[in-house]
């Protein structure tokens, strides 16, 4: 258009003026001028056959931005008009562009890159119909390389990089309006031949450079460019031969690409000289940190080589042996640079995880032994450097990252007992374990806080305040070190025991000295805490390692004593004196070594006893009023350890083990004095902590978690309730007396949960009645006393009244959290009385959001924990209560505007909680353990004959309430958005028959929400909406009402899903959900489906594509019978759809 109307000089003048406008500061030009300038460039790029004008621009214009746009116009027009262009003119255009760049070494980088990209696109488009191949380009590039001119060699590298980027993945390709299938096919063709050619050219350059002695700065820069190119080739994500476009997208999104080339690469990569070259290159440039990153990444990729490239196992063994030799030659005897640590650990990690273990063990044994020794040496060395980074509080923790990788590699090796005999890694494990302990202990035993020159580091306090808890931050490291400790239990357990016992003695001595000093001169406060701080930090790390060594983190599984620990205890049981062992366990106040025959104790029990001795010193210091000298961190470590230990060892269940250690079963088995004693001891610890440390929230929380562990298993709870302390704790908490009433809300909630769980231990009826009277009744009485006061309305905002109400609501949440199938009957009836009163509180506190939220949260917890056990009549009571709650909430929120878009998500906590409540009520339809009120036998059985309220009523009423409030602004909050869509999907799945009966406004809002979720939200939300469509379409098919709003809405959704599957890119995971919805919608709207297919086919200009699409659609619905809602037919359709997506999915999805 534009080019035809004006001559080249005028076009250039117009473009240069437009460029000036675009480059001008915002204050100098108006929006209209800017838009007009943009429009000029857009229409220029769309003009027909702009090649001559573009050549003229490139040769005459001096404005970089205009040159850039000319290159872009050429690239887009070549693809657009490909079929109309002569092969010769395409070839001359490509030659012109290359020559142009060659002759102008001073071009701006972004202009040069864009011109080379145009060349790459021409080559790519030509590769498909074989009209242009890369050979001529490679010939030209190899001539440029051999010129010896650094500028020209750099240009050659830029050409190869442009080709590589264009072909490498669909995410990096230019947006040139071609199908994803086309991009995938080009990549496959390219990776077989041309990619290898680029690699060989690159290897040639690297060989040439590695032979040279001295490189000028310019030559080094060229060397670096080619090394980066080699890295790009070796990090290529090789596409398997057949892969649909969705799978291509998923395949290419994987982060850590391992090297898996095709067979055609054997000669290039299995040639030992190639591997040697990369080791040589690294040795040459290792002191240049930027280049070292690339050379190590190349080696890490070569260390991950796998797949069809290896003809047999023998070739794999040879390759691996050769690689390990090269690696050892490179790193033995050198001081590793900081910039090499992560790269070297990646190489080792890849070798250990990618090569099968039988290949690893097949290399010469001496070589394997040297490799493991090297791994041991590096792990210890990186561990020391990582500890140093911690001390210096560095931002870039390279050694920590490298150390983590190596510890993971150890875990892979030591867990494999098929290929390595027992004890194979023991000595190495000892070295790594020792070095870890050494790095975490203060001098003189360890090197913690010593900088490289042996000087103590800056104050520890500054650092520890800023960081998350070590047990979370370093959990992976601790798990690996704990595992290595088990492998070498013979060494590690006695070591930990002696280190802990020795520090307990020193801590006891230090605290005594402080006490004497204080008694001698009460006013003096010249206490040097340095020694105490060092001791606390030592004990902190020793307890963490001990916890990870003795027990595993078990989530949702039955915790078992690790087999290595059990075997170790059994192996030495003949040398153990049980009575002495029990004496050491039962006298934590005495020094272990002062007990006669102390050396004949079980090592596992002795190690636990060492931690109990730490705990005892803490308790004695508290009794001696030295709490101010204690470390809350140590208190946390102790209860964390005791909880972890108790879950696994306390009342050990012999049925779970093939063989059991006699000392462990005697000390901690059922019906033993040892277990009764330790439960009493732990309970005392809990009570003491809650009194002394009530203001330390984390410590109090860890303490109540230990209490829950003691009562969550019935067998342990039976022992707990025999302790008088337990009853005292229950009474104290129920009376809300200090210091328990100072505990934070979450801690009080968990404490209530523990007290309720304890109440279901085995007791006679009278005792149980007495227990509930002391634990639950005071809660009820105090609550009723407060709310039934005549002037409650006036007093409700007083601080002590609000505190009482809050404490009661928190306690109710705790009671609900304690629900189990065998206690739900009692707890439900108890809680229902409260729920009705809570609704009244909603009125009183309607302007106090935090109280309103807490009231709703009580309902959320009750529904979440109990609904699945409730029979019909009980469930109805809960539904009625929830409905009343929603009605009150609705009345109080009428007309309340939520317009503050900048508000934080917390301000919408009430909406979130209501949605959670509705979702929990719906879950009854999925998970129902009730047996028509069977669990309530004897608890007012009550019939539901005159059912008045159903879950559907409550939930739809709730949705009616929520929908008008859920603006698009609110949906920007991810948690709100996900909870909202989860809820509406549930409703469509469970009550599809209720959807057509919704009021018109509500129905429209719901349909709009589904469309919004499918088109504008995350893939997770889109999937939920697709899952909602299937039941809605099925409902329509059942109702057979072709004029209903739902029928019309599903017709609209058919087009949306059709477009999504056929025309748009989307995640593979969604294909199944989309496919199911699509099938149901096609069954419902067969004529409309045929129309959509016809429209799509008639818009195709290319006869080949037309035919392929027509055949694919025919095959998709090939069945002679029309599609019907039949499971067998549906499954056949989904299978055909998968084939359809693989064959033509990429044809219409363009980029």
UniProtKB/Swiss-Prot annotation:
Where is this protein chiefly located? cytoplasm
InterPro entries given in the database record: ARM-like, ARM-type_fold, XPO1_C_dom, XPO4/7-like
Keyword Phosphoprotein among record annotations: yes
Report which superkingdom the organism of origin falls in. Answer: Eukaryota
Which keywords annotate this record? Cytoplasm, Nucleus, Phosphoprotein, Protein transport, Transport
Question: What biological process terms from GO does the record include?
Answer: protein transport
- Impact of changing residue 631 to A/R on the protein? Abolished binding to and nuclear export of hypusinated EIF5A
Consequence of changing residue 537 to Q/R:
Abolished binding to and nuclear export of hypusinated EIF5A
Q: Which residues carry this modification: Phosphoserine?
A: 464, 521
Q: GO MF terms on file?
A: nuclear export signal receptor activity
Signal sequence extent? none
Q: Give the residue spans that cross the bilayer.
A: none
List GO terms (cellular component aspect): cytoplasm; nucleus
* Known outcome of mutating residue 465 to R: Abolished binding to hypusinated EIF5A
Q: Where in the cell is it found?
A: Cytoplasm; Nucleus
Free-text function comment from the UniProt entry: Mediates the nuclear export of proteins (cargos), such as EIF5A, SMAD3 and isoform M2 of PKM (PKM2). In the nucleus binds cooperatively to its cargo and to the GTPase Ran in its active GTP-bound form. Docking of this trimeric complex to the nuclear pore complex (NPC) is mediated through binding to nucleoporins. Upon transit of a nuclear export complex into the cytoplasm, disassembling of the complex and hydrolysis of Ran-GTP to Ran-GDP (induced by RANBP1 and RANGAP1, respectively) cause release of the cargo from the export receptor.
Report the family membership: Belongs to the exportin family.
| Quaternary assembly | Interacts with Ran and cargo proteins in a GTP-dependent manner.
Protein name, as recorded: Exportin-4
Q: What gene makes this protein?
A: Xpo4
């Amino acid at each position: 258009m534009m080019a035809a109307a004006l001559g080249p000089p005028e076009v250039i003048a117009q473009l240069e003026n437009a460029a000036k406008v675009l480059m001008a500061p915002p204050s100098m030009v108006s929006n209209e001028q800017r838009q007009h300038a943009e429009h000029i460039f857009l229409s220029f790029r769309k003009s027909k056959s702009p090649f001559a004008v573009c050549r003229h621009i490139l040769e005459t214009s001096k404005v970089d931005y205009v040159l850039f746009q000319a290159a872009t116009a050429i690239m887009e027009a070549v693809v657009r008009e490909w079929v109309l262009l002569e092969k010769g003119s395409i070839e001359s255009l490509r030659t012109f562009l290359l020559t142009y760049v060659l002759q102008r070494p001073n071009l701006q980088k972004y202009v040069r890159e864009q011109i080379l990209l145009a060349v790459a696109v021409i080559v790519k488009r030509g590769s498909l119909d074989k009209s242009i191949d890369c050979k001529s380009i490679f010939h030209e590039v190899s001539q440029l390389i051999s010129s010896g001119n650094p500028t020209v060699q750099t240009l050659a590298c830029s050409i190869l990089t442009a080709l590589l980027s264009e072909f490498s993945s669909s995410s990096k390709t230019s947006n040139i309006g071609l199908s994803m299938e086309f991009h995938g096919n080009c990549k496959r063709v390219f990776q077989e031949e041309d990619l290898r050619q680029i690699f060989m050219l690159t290897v040639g350059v690297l060989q040439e450079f590695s032979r040279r002695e001295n490189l000028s700065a310019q030559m080094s820069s060229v060397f670096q460019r080619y090394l980066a190119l080699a890295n790009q080739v070796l990090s290529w994500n090789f596409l398997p031969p057949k892969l649909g476009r969705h799978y291509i997208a998923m395949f290419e999104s994987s982060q850590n690409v391992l090297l898996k080339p095709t067979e055609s690469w054997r000669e290039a990569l299995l040639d030992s000289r190639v591997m040697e070259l990369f080791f040589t290159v690294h040795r040459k440039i290792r002191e240049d940190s930027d280049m070292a990153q690339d050379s190590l990444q190349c080696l890490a990729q070569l260390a991950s080589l796998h797949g069809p490239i290896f003809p047999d196992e023998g070739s794999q063994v040879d390759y691996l042996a050769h690689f390990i030799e090269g690696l050892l030659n490179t790193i033995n005897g050198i001081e590793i640079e900081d910039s090499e640590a992560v790269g070297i650990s990646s190489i080792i990690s890849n070798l250990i995880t990618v090569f099968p273990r039988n290949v690893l063990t097949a290399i010469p044994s001496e070589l394997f032994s040297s490799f493991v020794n090297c791994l041991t040496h590096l792990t210890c060395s990186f561990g020391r450097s990582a500890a140093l980074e911690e001390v210096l509080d560095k931002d870039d923790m390279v050694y920590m990252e490298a150390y983590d990788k190596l510890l993971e590699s150890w875990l892979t090796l030591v867990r494999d007992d098929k290929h390595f005999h027992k004890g194979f890694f023991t000595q190495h494990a000892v070295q790594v374990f020792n070095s870890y302990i050494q790095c975490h202990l203060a001098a003189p035993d360890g090197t913690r806080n010593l900088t490289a020159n042996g000087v103590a580091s800056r104050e520890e306090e500054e650092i520890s305040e800023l960081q998350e808890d070590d047990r979370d931050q370093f959990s992976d490291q601790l798990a690996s070190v704990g595992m290595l400790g088990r492998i070498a239990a013979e060494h590690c357990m006695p070591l930990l025991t002696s280190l802990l016992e020795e520090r307990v003695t020193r801590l006891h001595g230090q605290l005594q000295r402080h006490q004497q000093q204080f008694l001698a001169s009460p006013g003096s406060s010249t206490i040097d805490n340095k020694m105490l701080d060092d001791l606390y930090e030592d004990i902190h790390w020793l307890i963490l390692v001990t916890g990870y060594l003795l027990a595993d983190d078990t989530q949702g599984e039955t915790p078992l004593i690790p087999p290595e620990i059990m075997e170790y205890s059994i192996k030495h049981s003949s040398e153990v004196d049980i009575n002495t062992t029990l004496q050491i366990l039962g006298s934590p106040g005495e020094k272990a070594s002062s007990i006669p025959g102390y050396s004949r104790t079980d090592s596992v029990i002795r190690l636990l006893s060492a931690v109990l001795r730490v705990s005892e010193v803490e308790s004695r210091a508290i009794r001696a009023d030295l709490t101010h000298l204690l470390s809350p961190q140590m208190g946390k470590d102790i209860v964390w350890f005791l909880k972890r230990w108790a879950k696994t060892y306390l009342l050990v269940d012999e049925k779970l083990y093939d063989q059991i250690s006699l000392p462990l079963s005697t000390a901690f088995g059922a019906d033993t004095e040892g277990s009764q004693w330790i439960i009493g001891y732990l309970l005392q610890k809990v009570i003491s902590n809650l009194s002394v440390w009530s203001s330390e929230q984390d410590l109090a929380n860890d303490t109540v978690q230990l209490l829950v562990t003691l009562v969550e298993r019935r067998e342990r709870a039976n022992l707990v309730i025999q302790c008088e302390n337990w009853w005292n704790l229950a009474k104290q908490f129920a009376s809300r007396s200090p210091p328990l009433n100072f505990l934070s809300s979450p801690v009080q909630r968990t404490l209530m949960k523990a007290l309720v769980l304890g109440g279901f231990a085995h007791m006679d009826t009278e005792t149980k009645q007495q227990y509930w009277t002391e634990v639950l009744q005071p809660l009820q009485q105090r609550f009723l006393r407060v709310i039934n006061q005549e002037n409650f309305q006036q007093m409700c905002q007083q601080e002590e009244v609000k505190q009482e109400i809050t404490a009661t609501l928190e306690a109710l949440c705790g009671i609900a959290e304690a629900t189990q199938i065998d206690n739900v009957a009692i707890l439900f009836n108890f809680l229902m009385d409260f729920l009705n009163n809570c609704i009244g509180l909603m009125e009183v506190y309607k302007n106090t959001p935090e109280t309103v939220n807490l009231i709703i949260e009580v309902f959320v917890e009750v529904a979440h924990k109990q609904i699945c056990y409730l029979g019909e009549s009980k469930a109805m009571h809960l539904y009625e209560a929830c409905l009343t709650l929603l009605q009150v909430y609705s009345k109080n929120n009428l007309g309340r505007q939520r317009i503050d878009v900048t508000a934080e998500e917390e301000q919408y906590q009430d909406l979130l909680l209501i949605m959670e409540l509705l979702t929990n009520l719906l879950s009854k339809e999925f998970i129902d353990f009730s047996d028509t009120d069977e669990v309530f036998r004897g608890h007012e059985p009550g019939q539901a004959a005159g059912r008045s309220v159903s879950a559907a009523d409550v939930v739809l009423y709730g949705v009616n309430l929520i929908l008008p409030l859920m603006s698009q602004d609110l949906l920007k909050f991810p948690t709100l958005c996900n909870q909202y869509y989860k809820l509406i999907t549930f409703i469509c799945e469970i009550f599809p028959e209720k959807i057509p009966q919704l009021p018109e406004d509500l129905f429209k809002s719901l349909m709009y929400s589904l469309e919004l979720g499918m088109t504008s939200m995350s893939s997770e939300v889109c999937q939920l909406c697709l899952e909602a469509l299937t039941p809605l379409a099925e409902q329509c098919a059942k109702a057979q009402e072709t004029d209903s709003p739902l029928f019309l809405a599903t017709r609209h959704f058919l087009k949306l899903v059709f477009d999504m599957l056929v025309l748009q890119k989307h995640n593979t995971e969604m294909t199944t959900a989309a496919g199911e919805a699509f099938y149901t919608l096609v069954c419902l709207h067969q004529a409309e489906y045929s129309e959509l297919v016809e429209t799509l086919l008639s818009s195709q200009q290319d006869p080949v594509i037309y035919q392929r699409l027509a055949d694919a659609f025919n095959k998709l619905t090939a069945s002679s019978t029309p599609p019907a809602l039949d499971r067998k037919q549906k499954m056949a359709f989904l299978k055909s759809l998968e084939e359809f997506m693989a064959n033509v999915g990429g044809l219409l999805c363009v980029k």
